[in-house]
Amino acid sequence: MPTDLYQGMSDFYNAFVQRNRDYKAIATELIDLFGDQQDILDVGIGTGLLVEQIIQLRPELQITGVDTSASLLEQAQQCLGTQVDLHCQDVVDLHLDKMFDLAYSRGGAWAFVNDGNTILLASHILDLDAIQQSFERVAAHLRDEGRLIIISSNANHGKREELDGEVTFERTVSKDGIEGEQYLILDYRCHRNGGLVGHQRVRMRLLDLDRVEEMLVAVGLGSISDHHNKYHIYQKKGSE
Ligand SMILES: C[S@@+](CC[C@H](N)C(=O)[O-])C[C@H]1O[C@@H](n2cnc3c(N)ncnc32)[C@H](O)[C@@H]1O
C-alpha cells in the first residue's frame, strides 16, 4: 500500500478546497485542451472534485484516476461511483493495464507554482530519481502523440477560511533548503471552536522548470505549449 500523505486531513480536505477553488472553471478550461481525446488519466485524483465536474461536462470520457491516498480515494469512489476507474497506486510505480491519450496532474503528484519570476515544479515525490521514474511511468502509459498536462497551482500561498463561525481551515506555507535543494512545507490545520482537530504536514520538492523539462525530454515528452504558464503541455513523440 503506498504512503498516504493526506491521511490526517481527509476529513476536512473537501471543505477546505471547495471554498478555495472553482473546479467547474478548471474543468471547462481543461476539457478544451482535451480536444477529441477519450482515454484520460488523472495523476493524484484526490477526492475526485475536478473529475466530478469533468464528467458532468463530458460524460463520454473514459477517466482513470490514481492516487496514493486510500482515504481520499474512498471519498472519490463515493462521489464518482463506477463512472471512473480508480486505483490506489504511486505514479512512481504506475502499472495499469491500459494506455491513455492524455494524462494530467492538477495539484496531484506534481504542479507548477509561480515563485516571483521563476516557475518551479512542486512535486509530492521527493527523490529526484523517483521523480524521473514517475515521468517515465506516465510516458509508458501514453499512446504515441499522447499528452501530459501539468497544471499550475497557487499551493505556495497561505490561506485561511472560516466555515461557519465554529470551524476554521488554514494552510500555511514555508520554504526549506536542505543540502542545496528547495522544499515547500505545507501545513494544513483545522480548528473547531479554537481547538485543533486536524493537522497534516505535506512536503514538496521544488525543481526549476528547465531541469524538469530536461527530465521530461529524457522520457520522450517534449514541451508544446504552456498556455500563459497555466497549463504546461508535453507531447510524446510518435514512433518513427
Ligand atoms: C493537493 S491533492 C490534489 C487532489 C486533486 N487533484 C484535486 O485537485 O483536488 C494532491 C493529491 O496527490 C496525491 N499524490 C501525491 N503523490 C502522489 C503519487 N506519487 N502518486 C499518486 N498520487 C499522489 C495525494 O495523495 C493527493 O490526493
Task: Please tell me what each predicted stretch does.
Residues 1-35, 37-46, 49:
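Conserved class I S-adenosyl-L-methionine
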Residues 49-93:
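Class I SAM-dependent methyltransferase SAM/SAH-binding core
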Residues 95-103:
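A short acidic, Gly/Pro-enriched loop at the edge of an enzyme's catalytic core
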Residues 111-130:
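Mobile active-site "lid"/loop adjacent to the S-adenosyl-L-methionine
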Residues 124-144:
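A short glycine-rich, Lys/Arg-flanked "PGG" loop and its adjoining helix->strand segment in the class I
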Residues 147-215:
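SAM-dependent methyltransferase
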Residues 211, 215-240:
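C-terminal lobe and adjacent flexible extensions of AdoMet/dcAdoMet transferase-like proteins
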